[in-house]
Amino acid sequence: ISEVKMDAEFRHDSGYEVHHQKLVFFAEDVGSNKGAIIGLMVGGVVIATVIVITLVMLK
């Protein structure tokens, strides 16, 4: 359920800061290894998105 919710939040164009704070809270809430892996994957997606947007802006 939380994965779908986070996916919906990513489609919503709010600030990256907000996403980062939600990721931190999400990581603190989930203590299992699965939660940590999901958190890392989502964090990687955010970083990749920022890089892509930066490259597009520079062109």
Curated annotation (Swiss-Prot):
It comes from the Eukaryota. It is found in: Cell membrane; Membrane; Perikaryon; Cell projection, Growth cone. The chain crosses the membrane at residues 35-58. Signal peptide: none annotated. It is a single-pass type I membrane protein. Proteolytically processed under normal cellular conditions. Cleavage either by alpha-secretase, beta-secretase or theta-secretase leads to generation and extracellular release of soluble APP peptides, S-APP-alpha and S-APP-beta, and the retention of corresponding membrane-anchored C-terminal fragments, C80, C83 and C99. Subsequent processing of C80 and C83 by gamma-secretase yields P3 peptides. This is the major secretory pathway and is non-amyloidogenic. The keyword ATP-binding does not apply. CDD domains: JMTM_APP. The record marks D13, S14 as: Cleavage. Pfam families: Beta-APP. GO terms for biological process: cognition. The gene is APP. Binds, via its C-terminus, to the PID domain of several cytoplasmic proteins, including APBB family members, the APBA family, MAPK8IP1, SHC1 and NUMB and DAB1. Binding to DAB1 inhibits its serine phosphorylation. Interacts (via NPXY motif) with DAB2 (via PID domain); the interaction is impaired by tyrosine phosphorylation of the NPXY motif. Also interacts with GPCR-like protein BPP, APPBP1, IB1, KNS2 (via its TPR domains), APPBP2 (via BaSS) and DDB1. In vitro, it binds MAPT via the MT-binding domains. Associates with microtubules in the presence of ATP and in a kinesin-dependent manner. This is Amyloid-beta precursor protein. PANTHER family: ALZHEIMER'S DISEASE BETA-AMYLOID RELATED, AMYLOID-BETA PRECURSOR PROTEIN.
